Amino acid sequence: MRTKLKLLAPALLLALTACNSTKPEPTANLGSGQTQMVKQFKSQKTQTFKINYLLFLPQDYDAKSEKRWPLILFLHGAGERGTNIWKVATHGPPKNVQEHPDFPFIVVSPQCPDGEHWSNEILLALLEQTVRDYTVDTNRIYLTGLSMGGFGTWDLGLTYPEKFAAIVPICGGGQMITVVLSSREKTQTLKTLGVWAFHGAKDPVVPLEESQRMVDGLKKVGVKDVKFTIYPDAGHNSWTEAYNDPQLYEWLLKHERK
């Protein structure tokens, strides 16, 4: 698919050009702007639980500078679980930054262990640690994920909407919308959250109705900033087109936590 890039600034344009589908080779930890760093996070609450993750720092990142950077927390799908951390860079932002060091976000991409699902507690602890260790713009923290990560995005984003400026769940769903519909306090917090959901109309794995139900529920409780893109010819893989769309990242950067 050829995307329209003329609306982007030059650096962002280069960063968001559609990537090819080859898997990245394991790369040494060369530092910011050159590759993603392989890191390990150990929860202080559960010392026995360790999670590996990829960390990308933009090319111009300088820890001594006063500039603070927007951050994307990316949740992969079930197929990328395990111990090979580079599987995480198969899709989405960690794939794009592997080839484009001028991507203008800090990107944190944890790997879920085999047989496990995303844990809100662990993800929040990892996010909080990253904010402590790096110069993050805490008003511009974004959450996105695909398939299993799409479910994780809905769950984490709707459970803790005050943590994020915007969320982008792709071919996901979940049960958190039931909690939202029954909680006035949660509804009020959600009204400041940007939401852009994506799904393929022909998805045989996660039915389109899963995303539709979430979007309809948000609109029902008065959440205004909700977008829903349905790709009419896409199956389960609606993420490639979504993550290769430069307008997605422009949309994210327009959102700040209020």
Outline where the language-model segments fall.
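C-terminal catalytic histidine-bearing segment of alpha/beta-hydrolase fold enzymes
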Residues: 198, 204-258
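Short, proline-enriched alpha-helix->beta-strand connector loops that line the catalytic pocket
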Residues: 189-195
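Gly/Ser-rich "nucleophile elbow"/oxyanion-hole loop immediately N-terminal to the catalytic nucleophile
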Residues: 60-67, 115-148, 161
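A domain-start/cap signature at the N-terminus of enzymes
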Residues: 19-71, 156, 181, 212-216, ...
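Primarily recognizes the serine-hydrolase "nucleophile elbow" in alpha/beta-hydrolase
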Residues: 139-188
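Active-site machinery of serine-nucleophile hydrolases
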Residues: 71, 75-121
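Bacterial N-terminal signal peptides that target proteins for export
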Residues: 1-8
